[in-house]
Amino acid sequence: MKGKWKILSFIMATILCVAIFAGCGTQENTSSASNEPAVSGAADTTKQIDTMVIGTTMKITSISRETYDFDVLSGTLTHMALVKQDENGDLKPFMAESFETKDNKTWTFQLRKGVTWHDGEPVTAQDVKFTAELQNTFPNYTIRVVDDQTVEFVSETENARLPIDLVTFRILPEHIFKDVTDLETFTDEKSAIGNGPYEFVKFDESAGTLEFKAYENYIDGKPNVDKIIVKLYANTDTLY
């Protein structure tokens, strides 16, 4: 399952790069991978693009964060992880401004200033701690909030892989999730609020579409594509 998550996450990250920087010329992805989205509407980098349509065979019936495919899809569009992998597979700070360790036991992450949730609230180190503890994502670590912009992951044993694990760690806003008792049934629109380049707009189950819009205050600048529509297909025969 983790391998599939990484593949789908990579696919969505590639699409996100196209959306933010707008690939040159019109192009269409005709890959036959069952969960790989097909993209139409990519365009000239010099223009602001109104809409990009993505076709996918992902199985999405709910906007719950516990819905696997929705988490992969929206998480890549709507959230920034602390760490990302570049096109060469090298680890780079993302929502974090920097990260370091001296012994592979205590990892310190300095968050970028100015990152906000889509409702305007600031993203803080407390959100990182809250999410990790809520989901029990890192059971072998104690999460320490040093200040609003600094968080530590502390373990009794060495682990050089922690930054890799954080690439797929989607942080949640504590001010929204602190009173949620069941993540699986929490499907309020606020459940999809993130801190990334796109805001979740709506899920039309009858039409089989999800809509996202560019976040005006995204810390790395508003994406070149104003709106992304994800259209769900039953199989690859109807997708292409």
Kindly give the residue locations of the regions a language model identified.
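N-terminal lobe/hinge region of extracytoplasmic solute-binding protein
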Residues: G55-K102, I193
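Short, solvent-exposed loop/turn elements at domain surfaces
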Residues: T45-Q48, I60-T67, D90-K92, R161-I164, ...
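Gly/Pro-rich hinge or "lid" segments in bacterial periplasmic/extracellular proteins
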Residues: D86, D90, T168-P223, K227, ...
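Short, well-ordered beta-strand elements
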Residues: Q48-T61, T106-Q110, V128, V151-F153, ...
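Aromatic- and charge-enriched surface segment that lines or borders ligand/interaction sites
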Residues: E97-N136, V146, E152
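Surface-exposed binding/hinge segments that line
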Residues: E100, T137-V180, P197, D204
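Short helix-initiation/N-cap motifs at beta->coil->alpha
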Residues: D148, I229-Y240
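Short, low-complexity disordered leader/linker segments with a strong preference
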Residues: M1-M52, D90, N136, T142, ...
